[in-house]
A protein has these predicted regions:
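Residues that define the transmembrane beta-barrel architecture of outer-membrane proteins
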Residues: 39, 61-67, 111-115, 159-165, ...
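Gram-negative outer-membrane beta-barrel proteins
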Residues: 51-57, 89-95, 139-147, 187-191
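Extracellular loop and loop/strand-boundary signature of outer-membrane beta-barrel proteins
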Residues: 55-58, 101-108, 149-156, 183-186
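Outer-membrane beta-barrel "beta-signal"
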Residues: 42, 171, 192-204
Length: 204
């Protein structure tokens, strides 16, 4: 009996290193197996404050609730082609009689929207914290409701093309979810637009 037990123990002892090696090899293979790749497509929504660069009269507003929808396709791990749709809330202006007579504008309301196309360059600053730099071109639509001193009211729509630049930070909350803060600037002289916003994005 003792010989049988001894042989059994010896067999187990001989097989144990091989079993441990196989287990270790399996665990190593699982560790080295890459995570399933995403499609490299992301989309998000932000809300915040929009600012109009507006040489307006004696009583005017330049800020309004605004926001943007955005999405992109990664070209490399740190570079993506991106499109944004930005909407800027309505602001208004009222001129004093003297200025109204000079400009032929008694009061005015305006709002704007823009579609931008450009690139999003990402640089990881810290673990899960990424810096975003954006550059592109914007197609801007402006809508104005103008009240003339005579009492007439007219609506005017116009389109302009202008450069778009932006910067921001994002924090990766989970693997495919980020929260972000962004600054966007549509560079168009006295018609420039600014957007300060926060929001989130998902990657697919």
């Amino acid at each position: 009996m003792s010989k049988i037990v001894s042989r059994t123990v010896s067999s187990i002892a001989a097989a144990l290193p091989l079993a441990l090696a196989l287990i270790g090899s399996s665990a190593s293979a699982q560790t080295l197996t890459p995570q399933p790749r995403t499609l490299g497509i992301y989309a998000g929504i932000n809300a915040g404050v929009g600012v109009y660069e507006w040489d307006c009269g004696t009583s005017c507003g330049r800020t309004a609730f605004s926001g943007k929808l955005f999405g992109g396709k990664r070209l490399t791990p740190g570079l993506a082609a991106e499109v944004n749709y930005m909407f800027f809330g309505r602001v208004d202006n009222a001129n004093e009689p003297g200025l109204a007579a000079t400009t032929n504008i008694a009061a005015e309301e305006r709002k704007a929207s823009a579609i931008t196309l450009g690139i999003n360059w990402e640089v990881e600053l810290l673990h899960d914290v990424t810096n975003h730099l954006r550059i592109g071109v914007a197609r801007v639509k402006r809508e104005q409701d103008i009240a003339r001193p005579s009492g007439a009211v007219e609506s005017v729509s116009s389109y302009r093309t202008a450069p778009h630049v932006g910067a921001g930070l994002s924090l990766q909350v989970v693997r495919d979810l980020r929260i972000n803060t962004n600054f966007d600037y549509i560079v168009d002289g006295e018609n420039s637009l600014y957007l300060f916003s926060v929001g989130g994005s998902m990657e697919f």
